Structures are given as structure tokens and as C-alpha cells.
Amino acid sequence: FRPPYAQITPAQARLLGQRYKLVMWDIISRDYNRKLSPRTCLRNVTKYLAPGAIVVFHDSEKAFRNMRYALPRTLEKIRQMGLKCKAIEF
């Protein structure tokens, strides 16, 4: 479970932790911000890429323009760095 806005109270964490694994992110693309250019969105991610990083992109209409530009370029950068994307194992 990824808490919206990366905000969660200790009580919520305890309750959710009974049924779910909590997953926080390291890097947020801010693709939802229509004031940001697609290139800025890409920089928000690639500037901080590192092994083990968890990156957030959003699958919403609001984020589509930036995500459509930044996601494939982020994946290419990941390959260039010799890193791999994989599912989180629980």
C-alpha cells in the first residue's frame, strides 16, 4: 500500500500493516503538476535515480502529458545505468 501524498499517521500504519505491506517512494516525478514541463518532470526523476529507488508516476489524465514523455526516457536511463526494474517482493 502506498499512502497518498506519502502521508500516514502511526495509527493508520499499524492498522494497514495488519493486512498490507506499506511501500514508500524515494523519487516522485510530479507528473501530475500541469505547470511543470515534461522535461522538468524527467529531471525530477533522473537526477536522483539510484539502485533500489522507488519512483512514482501517476496513471491519471492530469499526469498523462508529462508521464508519456518522462516514463520511457526514465526507463531508457535506467537501462543506460545498468539498473533493472522489478516488482517489489513481499
Name every feature range the model reports, one short phrase each.
Residues 34, 62-63:
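Acidic/histidine-rich helix-loop elements
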Residues 65-90:
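C-terminal domain-boundary segment and adjacent tail
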Residues 1-7:
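Hydrophobic, well-structured mid-protein blocks that either form specific transmembrane helices
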Residues 7, 12-48, 82-90:
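His/Asp/Glu-enriched short active-site or ligand-binding loop at hydrolase and phosphoryl-transfer sites
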Residues 1, 22, 55, 78:
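Conserved, mostly hydrophobic/aromatic
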Residues 6, 55-59:
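Histidine-centered catalytic micro-motifs
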Residues 2, 56, 87-89:
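Short beta-strand segments
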